[in-house]
Amino acid sequence: MRTWKKGTAVASTSTLDNVINLCKRRGFVFPCGEIYGGTRAAWDYGPFGVELKENIKRQWWRAMVTRRDDVVGLDSSVILPREVWVASGHVGVFNDPLTECLSCHKRMRADHLQEGHAAKHGIADPDSISLEEVNCPNCGNKGQWTEPRDFNMMLKTYLGPVEDKSGLHYLRPETAQGIFVNFQNVLTSARKKPPFGIAQTGKSFRNEITPGNFIFRTREFEQMEMEFFVEPGTDEEWHQYWIDVRTAWYTDLGINPDNLRHYEHPKEKLSHYSKRTVDVEYKFGFSGSDWGELEGIANRTDFDLGNHSRHSGKDLSYYDQANNKRYLPYVIEPAAGLTRSLMAFMVDAYTEDEAPNAKGGVDKRTVLKLDPRLSPVKAAVLPLSRNSDLSPKARDLAARLREHWNVDFDDAQAIGKRYRRQDEIGTPFCITVDFDSLEDDAVTIRERDTMAQQRVSIDKVEEYLGGKLLGC
C-alpha cells in the first residue's frame, strides 16, 4: 500500500486486508455461489474485476504477441486426451505429499506445513523440519500427523455415456501441453522457425489440497503462458532474456521494483521437466511469508517435445535447412497467473491519502493508483446535478466517449462522494459537466492522482483523453 505523507510512501501491514475488503465492496470479486454458502477458494469476478482482468490480459497479449514478430497465438482445448497427460508426466508425477492431522482429521500438504513452520521460526531449510515439530494450523495439536502420501492434483472427468477408462479425461492443469501437441501445426501454418514462441491464455484446473490467500491459490485459475522454442545450446541465454523481459513487464505497468524479487528453485526441488526455474515473486504480505509467486520462467529443455514424439510416434523435431541439421527444440516457458497478477497490481496501487471536503476540512481518501492501461474505467462523466439541462449534455458526452473507452456515468449523491467512488476503483479521469458548461461549452477534467483540475472545451475532450490514455 502507498500511504502518502510529505511525499513519502510508507508500507502498511493491513494493505492486503484493505484490498480484499475493497474487492468485495466495490464489485471486483465475489465469493462463488454465495447465496448457497459458497465454495471454498472459488471466486466470481464482478463488473470492475472482469474489466481489470481483461485489461491485464490485453497488455500481456500486446507485449508477448502483437508487438513481436517471433510469437504467435493459440487457443487450445481445456479437455485433452488422457494420453497427452501420460506423455507429459502429469499422470505419473503431478503429485503433492498429503498428510492428515490425527486429531481433527484435516488433510494438508506436508511441504506447506514445513514451509510455514520454517517461515515462522526463521529456519532456512524447510526440508530439515520433522512433522513431529509442527502444530496443526486447524486445531493446534502438535506432531500428530499421518505419514505423507502422494496425492494427484489433476481433476478427472468422463466423456460419453459410460464412466469407464475409455472415457477418462482430465481438465488441463496447465495450458502448456495444448501448445506442445500443436507445435508442428503452428510451425507449418504460421511459417515460423526457431527461435519462436506460441502463446495462449486460458483456464486451468488443479485439485489443490490447501487453496487460500484470497484469489492467490485456487482450484480454477487463469494462466498467461508462452512456450518459446530455441536451438539447444542457446537455451540458457534465452532463459535469462525472458527472465529480464517478464520482470520489466510488471514494473512498466506500475509495480514498485522493491516489491519484486527473483527466486531460484533449488535443483532438488525442480519440476520433473525443468533444467532451471526462476520465479518472479511479489511482496504480498501474507501471514507467515511475505512473498508469493507471480510467474515462473522455466527452461523445460526438450522434455515435452521429446516425450510427445515418443508417445505419439510423430516426429516433432525441426530441420534447420541453412545448417543442414535436425534437432528437438528446447523450450523456455514464461508462465504467469492472471489473478495473481491482478492481486499484485491492486495491492501495489492501493493508496490512502487526504482530500479536501465541502466543509473546508479534509477526508481520508482511498485511491487505486493503477496504470491507466489497467484501470477498469478510463473516465467517469459526472453532471453536477440531475438538472434537466445538464443531464442530457453529460449523457451525450459519455456516449461519445464510449466509442473509444469504458466510461462510467454517475449522477447520484454529492460530487465529492462521486469522486471518492471513482478514486476507489482507479478511474484516472473524472469529467464534471456543470452549469458553466451550458454557457461556455466546456467541462472540468479532474486527474485522479494529483486531483488537479483543468477546463477543457467539450469538443476537445476526446483529443485530451486520447493523449493521456495511450496504449489503453
Swiss-Prot record:
It is an enzyme of class 6 (ligase). Substrate binds at R109, E174, F221, E222, Q223, M224, E225, E333, P334, A335, A336, G337. It catalyses: tRNA(Gly) + glycine + ATP = glycyl-tRNA(Gly) + AMP + diphosphate. It is found in: Cytoplasm. The keyword Iron does not apply. GO terms for cellular component: cytoplasm. Its main location: cytoplasm. PANTHER family: DNA POLYMERASE SUBUNIT GAMMA-2, MITOCHONDRIAL, GLYCYL-TRNA SYNTHETASE/DNA POLYMERASE SUBUNIT GAMMA-2. This is Glycine--tRNA ligase. The gene is glyQS.
